[in-house]
Design a protein with these regions (language model features):
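N-terminal secretory signal peptides that target proteins for export/translocation
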Residues: 1-2
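A beta-strand edge to alpha-helix "cap/lid" segment located at domain peripheries
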Residues: 24-53, 60-145
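Bacterial N-terminal signal peptides
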Residues: 6-19
Length: 145
């Protein structure tokens, strides 16, 4: 079954059908990883369409400083003005699947424009909606290097 799913996923990407919705049909751990990476890239690129796809409508986004934003507020802040993120690099990613819910933990090194790089510990909750995994909750805490 795993070989078949990997083959189908590979075939779908070859046809240009890749993305979060397609990945959800394969291994859920890899589907969540793909959505997480897509979200990071969308935030850095200020890609509103991709952010809308990867973030759940009822998103609760809690920044390391304690500020909490809705999906609309988070996207508006990412899109406002020049790019905010220079890079986001994640390591130590661990994903646990619980039916249609996934919990992702990791460390992230974040570089904002005109700000020294800092490290956070992240906790993400993803839900599968209509065959597509989406980020529904984000929490981060600053940690030392």
């Amino acid at each position: 079954m795993i070989r078949c799913s990997a083959f189908l996923l590979s075939f779908a990407f070859t046809l240009g059908l890749g993305g979060a919705a397609t990945a959800a049909a394969a291994d859920p751990t890899e589907a969540v990883r793909a959505v997480a990476e897509g979200w990071y890239q969308a935030a850095v690129r200020q890609d509103r369409e991709a952010l809308n796809k990867y973030l759940a409508d009822d998103l609760s986004y809690c920044h390391a400083g304690g500020k909490v934003q809705t999906k609309a507020e988070y996207i508006a802040s990412v899109m406002a003005g020049p790019p905010h993120y220079e890079s986001m690099t994640y390591d130590g990613m661990h994903i646990s699947i619980y039916g249609k819910t996934a919990v992702l933990t990791s460390f992230a090194d974040i570089k904002l424009v005109n700000t020294p790089q800092f490290r956070v510990r992240t906790l993400h909750v993803y839900v599968e909606n209509g065959g597509q995994w989406q980020l529904v909750a984000h929490e981060s805490t600053r940690v030392g290097k």
